Amino acid sequence: MRRDQAQRPIIIAAGGTGGHFFPAEALAAELKRRGRQIVLMTDARSGGLTSTVFADTDRFVLPGAGIAGRGIRRAGQAVIALGHGVVKAGALLRRLEAGCIVGFGGYPCIPPVLGARLRARNVPVILHEQNAVLGRANRLLARKIHCLALSFASTSHVPAGTRTLVTGNPVRPAIAALAGTSYTPPGTEGVINLLILGGSLGARVLSDVVPAALALLPPALRQRMRVTQQCRAEDIDRVRMAYAACGIEAILAPFFTDVATLIADAHLVIARAGASTVAELATIGRPAIMVPLPGAIDDHQTANARILVDAQGGWMIRQPDFTPDTLAARIAGLLAEPGTLADAARNAARLGMQDAVARLADTVEQSLDTARAPQGDFKGEIKS
């Protein structure tokens, strides 16, 4: 007996790095709270990301969901794996009687979406784009879906004719719980909390430059610094020694489970400009110096950082200019003007869409109600 549309599981297709996975986790938590059944389709890389939300969720690892690579041989292997992934996803979607598919970009969302077009054409597909530049997987699939949910109205590279809806970028429940936490800039005395985030894969340049920059600050400032820094496991010992050499207290780890509290406690954040980091800074409202990843596809991290900079919610230093001297001068200047930090915190908070996860969940539930309509009935814009 076939299930009613509203009782069918919602398929979340996400994996790879935290930038794709964390918004998916936030949506899953909200949909579970609403009593919906969730199934995760992902790649092998997501196994390294800690998630209590998906701990009791059916999880299917699909071949072809992590096909990045270079070279003719690798490309051929990727095409074969992708084909297997599409076939497997299509069969799973039919067996599970999926109600809706929500993809979060990156290669892990390709097999389920193409599988749906092959074997489950009546299943509505929603894609979410976290960055200010539409990712290549989402660009490839955009014309095959019911709705494209955007984090920013100004997102570029959206194909003409795509039905779009601005929902914002969902953040994890722990981040949302601290939305709009009041900010007090550091005074002339007391501890200065500095948080350095390198993304879910770490960022060696931050481990190289930040300790050297702080060592250039006057001793009176250094002795007030309390640094919490995310860095690769293999870098921890040398970074710890660098901070110890200049008398700075530092907590170092490859990954922090309490990142929401760390952001809320920070006077200043130095970070990559991944979509989740930008969304988390805006949700809580904290000033940040952004260092975009120079090799990011389509330079999307620079576009993300530009959103924050244009709103006067932070500052950007491109990696070629990210030297100890440049960073030390910027930090010293900001600490000398606490009002500037406070203004940036307020401006960052104005960017935050605190109801992003509710907006996206509403869109998903609406798709269940309109699944039989050939074009759906979303109240989004058609991109011209």
From Swiss-Prot:
One of its GO terms (biological process) is regulation of cell shape. GO terms for cellular component: plasma membrane. CDD domains: GT28_MurG. Coiled coil: none annotated. UDP-N-acetyl-alpha-D-glucosamine binds at T17, G18, G19, N131, R172, S200, Q301. It is an enzyme of class 2 (transferase). Cell wall formation. Catalyzes the transfer of a GlcNAc subunit on undecaprenyl-pyrophosphoryl-MurNAc-pentapeptide (lipid intermediate I) to form undecaprenyl-pyrophosphoryl-MurNAc-(pentapeptide)GlcNAc (lipid intermediate II). This is UDP-N-acetylglucosamine--N-acetylmuramyl-(pentapeptide) pyrophosphoryl-undecaprenol N-acetylglucosamine transferase.
